[in-house]
């Protein structure tokens, strides 16, 4: 009898998780095979950016020692590396050694390069265009005399040739749709807008509370806005010292004359971004900073109607901007705050880091402190030269119960800051930043989307959300409700004050804007 020794292997038992991942990988593999069979690999999608394309372009950029500016992949209109002095800027570099010059002697801003390069996936060499050529005049860097101005045929041809925009944030921009912005003055009885035909214009009024007596008055002007994004985390309205109002509508920035209530110009950025995410005027002069959904910050001169330069460095939506003389601070949804000195070629002089998206940035009136509000509910106070030092540590961090978006420094008390609470909070917080404690905290019973101080009347105006969707007025220092502006049918996203501090511009998510006489 022969004995045979049989070796038995232990049977491997697959878990449910392993089987699930096998099924997922099998489905992905089948999908990739179908895509290969349906079309040639040389064909380019005009909208979606695949991970392989993103990775290959990113590696090529790093190998060529060209800094990735404004997005994971280069922008469609990119300054030529050979002519762009700011492309070699580094975050670790300190501030410029020269002494800041007085603004009275004139602001000197380093202009953009003279050569623009149109990048594409074609195998041909990049096409270089001069500023004076007709093709550049049809590009995104233009002022439009009409709201609908724009060469749409050029954009369609660009898409059919496979020249796609590679600077889109890959996490959110897929499937995004561009909206053409419009700005129309309400002409009362002749207005054909929906709502005005049914007498909705008569519902707009200002009410002042004085005991049992209520005084009411109508707004100076009512404006219809098309393309205003209903986004709590954007800052798309600002009123300049030269009485010019800038409001971002879709892919354009409209400039409106606050004196004679007339529309002047609009900046069309439809080719290089999906929407404009933030605007702010320089305190002195006509320089306008524009943040885009692609992480770009552009500087424009409203008088000469020319673009001054691009400030690269962000990888996501730039939702907050704030000037401190010649230093521009920009905050993104990835939690980065960059400080740009617009007078020098290597503009980036400091960087701050947050864990969540930056919702708001405000420099104090004296320029000594910077406050930043984030989506994680942290209100952070930074020194005058944040990020440029060795450590770049904040002076104080004040936790809040909701995201910190509505925020403004007191004009007559430099160490007092007003912060509006979100939906879960609904309170107006007036803080002493030295102690970090609340001075007054009245409840508004709604989301505070925007706020601004009124120095003439010593009040605070807050843009409210549901259920009233009004602009509430609070008397300082008691913070009692003293009145309000009524008529908006959706939350009041943005507020801005005129340079003479007598009029208030309110813009709501229902597409209406009003100019109110506040004193």
UniProtKB/Swiss-Prot annotation:
Main localisation: cytoplasm
UniProt cross-references to PANTHER family, sorted A to Z: CELL DIVISION CYCLE 20 CDC20 FIZZY -RELATED, CELL DIVISION CYCLE PROTEIN 20 HOMOLOG B
Family: Belongs to the WD repeat CDC20/Fizzy family.
Function comment: Protein regulator of centriole-deuterosome disengagement and subsequently participates in the ciliogenesis in multiciliated cells (MCCs).
Keyword Cell inner membrane: no
Listed InterPro entries: Cdc20/Fizzy, WD40/YVTN_repeat-like_dom_sf, WD40_CDC20-Fz, WD40_repeat_dom_sf, WD40_rpt
Encoding gene, per UniProt annotation: Cdc20b
GO cellular component: cytoplasm; deuterosome
One MF term in the entry's GO annotations: ubiquitin-protein transferase activator activity
Protein name, per record: Cell division cycle protein 20 homolog B
Region of interest (Disordered), ranges: 77-106
SUPFAM superfamilies on file: WD40 repeat-like (SSF50978)
Keywords: Cytoplasm, Repeat, WD repeat
Cellular localisation: Cytoplasm
Tissue: Expressed in multiciliated cells (MCCs).
């Amino acid at each position: 009898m022969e004995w045979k020794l049989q070796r038995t292997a232990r049977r491997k038992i697959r878990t449910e998780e392993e089987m699930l991942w096998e099924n997922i990988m099998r489905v992905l593999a089948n999908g990739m095979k179908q895509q290969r069979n349906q079309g040639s690999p040389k064909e380019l999608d005009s909208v979606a950016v695949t991970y392989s394309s993103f990775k290959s372009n990113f590696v090529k950029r790093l190998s060529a020692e060209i800094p990735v500016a404004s997005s994971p992949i280069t922008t469609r209109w990119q300054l030529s590396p050979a002519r762009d002095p700011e492309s070699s800027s580094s975050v670790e570099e300190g501030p410029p050694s020269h002494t800041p010059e007085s603004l009275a002697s004139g602001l000197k801003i380093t202009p953009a390069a003279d050569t623009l390069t149109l990048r594409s996936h074609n195998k041909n060499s990049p096409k270089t265009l001069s500023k004076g050529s007709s093709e550049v005049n049809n590009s995104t860097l233009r002022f439009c005399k009409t709201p609908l101005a724009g060469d749409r045929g050029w954009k369609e041809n660009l898409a059919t040739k496979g020249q796609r925009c590679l600077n889109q944030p890959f996490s959110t921009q897929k499937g995004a749709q561009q909206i053409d912005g419009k700005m129309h003055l309400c002409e009362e009885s002749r207005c054909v807008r929906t709502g005005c035909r049914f007498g909705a214009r008569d519902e707009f009024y200002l009410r002042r509370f004085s005991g049992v007596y209520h005084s009411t008055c109508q707004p100076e002007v009512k404006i219809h806005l098309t393309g205003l994004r209903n986004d709590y985390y954007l800052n798309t309205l600002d009123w300049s010292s030269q009485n010019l109002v800038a409001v971002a509508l879709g892919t354009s920035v409209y400039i409106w004359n606050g004196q004679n209530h007339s529309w002047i110009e609009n900046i069309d950025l439809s080719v290089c971004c999906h929407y404009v995410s933030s605007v702010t005027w320089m305190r002195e002069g006509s320089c306008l900073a524009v943040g885009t959904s692609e992480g770009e910050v552009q500087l424009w001169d409203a008088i000469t109607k020319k673009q001054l330069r691009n400030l690269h460095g962000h990888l996501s939506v730039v939702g907050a901007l704030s000037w401190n003389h010649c230093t521009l601070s920009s905050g993104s949804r990835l939690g980065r705050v960059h400080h740009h000195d617009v007078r020098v070629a290597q503009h980036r002089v400091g960087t701050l880091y947050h864990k969540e998206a930056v919702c708001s940035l405000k420099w104090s009136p004296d320029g000594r402190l910077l406050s930043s509000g984030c989506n994680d509910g942290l209100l952070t106070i930074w020194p005058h030269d944040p990020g440029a030092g060795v450590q770049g540590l904040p002076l104080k961090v004040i936790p809040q119960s909701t995201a910190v978006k509505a925020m403004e420094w007191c004009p007559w008390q430099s160490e007092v800051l007003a912060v509006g609470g979100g939906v879960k909070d609904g309170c107006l917080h007036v803080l002493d930043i030295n102690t970090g404690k609340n001075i007054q905290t009245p409840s508004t019973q709604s989301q505070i989307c925007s706020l601004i101080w009124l120095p003439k009347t010593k009040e605070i105006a807050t843009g409210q959300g549901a259920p009233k969707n009004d602009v509430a007025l609070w008397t300082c220092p008691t913070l009692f409700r003293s009145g309000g502006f009524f008529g908006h049918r959706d939350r009041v996203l943005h507020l801005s004050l005129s340079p003479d501090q007598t009029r208030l511009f309110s813009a709501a998510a229902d597409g209406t804007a009003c100019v109110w006489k506040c004193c």
